[in-house]
């Protein structure tokens, strides 16, 4: 069942990035954009800078696009708590769960958002015929979609008061929106030759065979606008 979006924060455009695609959007809304790497990497890293500018104690912010962002209050769980709900660990797990801020569980959504932005730019570039670098451009958003589902399971079980509150409503709306984006991007990029990788295929096979994990993601995604 669709839910109305929570109140969204506004992010002002701060540069005259040329174009009307996702790359121009994310680069144009950051005061210190990354522009010296590939377009995929630039979008990914610039998303982190926007999130950093939005972050404050106990609250994380994530850029959605078109000058809008969402601010989410941290639930009372740790990243280690979330890790216990992760059924299938991809190759990025250690970096973002073991070596990250344990007391900021929504930090992983900063990475999820960054992988979404990178994948969006990569898929748009593929569709427009741009020259593509060899990179697993869409596997990150797929891997983090499974971690986002684990986050939801964890918060629902470990902090039910948060899950039932307006803060929980906002988190569910955001997760649903991002899971839907991740699904569309992964499907769009799955058969792009430059994006293929053995690690991607292996992780997808393990995850898609686990119907319990798939059902959690589908239940969350069904809340999307």
Predicted features and spans:
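Active-site recognition of the HExxH zinc-binding catalytic motif
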Residues: 39-57
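Short alpha-helical hairpin
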Residues: 16-24, 84-91
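Post-HEXXH active-site segment of zinc metalloproteases
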Residues: 52-95
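Pan-zinc metallopeptidase signature
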Residues: 116, 120-225
């Amino acid at each position: 069942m669709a839910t109305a979006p929570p109140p969204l924060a506004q992010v002002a455009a701060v540069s005259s990035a040329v174009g009307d695609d996702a790359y121009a959007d994310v680069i144009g809304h950051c005061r210190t954009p990354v522009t010296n790497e590939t377009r995929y990497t630039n979008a990914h890293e610039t998303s982190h800078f926007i999130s950093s500018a939005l972050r404050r104690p106990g609250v994380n912010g994530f850029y959605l696009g078109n000058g809008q962002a969402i601010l989410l209050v941290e639930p009372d769980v740790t990243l280690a708590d979330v890790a216990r709900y992760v059924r299938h660990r991809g190759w990025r797990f250690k970096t973002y769960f073991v070596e990250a801020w344990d007391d900021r569980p929504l930090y992983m959504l900063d990475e999820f958002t960054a992988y979404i932005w990178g994948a969006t730019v990569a898929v748009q570039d593929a569709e427009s015929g741009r020259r593509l670098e060899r990179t697993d451009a869409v596997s990150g958003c797929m891997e983090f979609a499974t971690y986002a589902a684990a986050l939801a399971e964890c918060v629902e079980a470990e902090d039910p008061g948060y899950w039932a509150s307006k803060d929980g409503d906002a988190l569910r709306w955001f997760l649903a929106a991002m899971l839907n984006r991740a699904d569309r991007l992964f499907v769009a990029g799955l058969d792009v030759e430059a994006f293929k990788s053995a690690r991607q295929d292996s992780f997808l096979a393990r995850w898609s065979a686990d119907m319990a994990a798939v059902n959690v993601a589908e239940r969350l995604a069904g809340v999307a606008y």
